[in-house]
Regions:
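N-terminal glycine-rich FAD/FM-binding segment characteristic of electron-transfer flavoproteins
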Residues: 1-151
Length: 151
């Protein structure tokens, strides 16, 4: 089982939200791929390759990825995740991740699961509701789950 983590970065290093998403992805077991998208993102890809649990770093580098537009990145993530290549697609629960994951989920024709705080098993998560006052279990039988993960 493979998991795809979409990296948020500052063109030099991975954001802490992405590091948290990588840690959460390790709960799925299996291999973890990190997708680094941008313009001139060699340093980020090198940093991602040193993170524990990361199996493979996928780098997509082009001028039109330079501004980090969610629509461009979502289309790329959809092409990678379609066809059963990944069990889950994760991003950190930052503004980057919350902007991106609904688009990826829509392109994959699945429902996103936001603000996950615990991964119990593939397809079984915990997330807060009511302004964080209640933690609820969420179960998914979708072919691929698209998640934002709180660190």
């Amino acid at each position: 089982m493979r998991t795809l983590v979409i990296a948020e970065h500052d063109k030099a290093r991975l954001a802490s939200a992405t590091l948290g998403a990588i840690t959460a992805a390790s709960r799925f077991g299996g291999e973890i791929d990190v997708l680094v998208v941008g313009d001139a993102c060699d340093a980020v890809a090198a940093h991602a390759s040193t993170v524990q649990s990361v199996t493979r770093v996928l780098k997509a580098e082009a001028p039109y990825y330079g501004d980090g537009t969610a629509e461009n990145i979502a289309a790329l993530a959809q092409r990678l995740a379609s066809g059963g290549a990944y069990r889950a697609v994760l991003a950190g629960a930052s503004s980057f991740g919350k902007n991106l994951t609904p688009r990826v989920a829509a392109l994959l024709d699945v429902a996103p699961v936001s603000d996950v705080i615990a991964i119990e098993a593939p397809g079984r998560y915990r997330r807060p509701i009511y302004a964080g006052n209640v933690i609820v279990p969420v179960e998914s039988d979708q072919p691929v789950d698209v998640l934002t993960v709180r660190a």
